[in-house]
């Protein structure tokens, strides 16, 4: 049926498609390391677009890949539908503390300028890339996400924006990430 999707990739994508509790296909289900990097995103997008009816994300790792994702979505949905609806989104992380890099700004430009959505998820380990206190880490995450939101709205007012966060802490003794600590339940409320 399609040369680029075989073996475990096909199996994983089939499982994602068949589970009714999974409402989204994501983007990188399984990294196809046997495909050249400059073409990998095209194969993954084609698989999502032809083998599943679930929404999915697009590529963000380079401006051309983000643009390819938006262009492929336009081929599938048409310009009129795409102008009126968000049909694909990109998911980016800020580089804490308080840095929005080239990858984020270029992906935001590719998606938002065409009215497509961006999911922005600051990744902060309290005590390493952010303040030790829970409240200060949340404030930093909000500031980082709002920087990207403001940029997106400058590019195209009203462009869709989803704010997420990935906040955790680290042991100040060992430096190891400490997932599952009680502070995190307060952060994700």
Where are these regions (language model features)?
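Residue-level signal for functionally critical sites in structured catalytic/ligand-binding pockets
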Residues: 1, 5, 48, 144, ...
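Catalytic alpha/beta active-site cores
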Residues: 8-9, 13-131, 135
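Glycine-rich anion/phosphate-binding loop at the beta-strand->alpha-helix junction
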Residues: 91-187
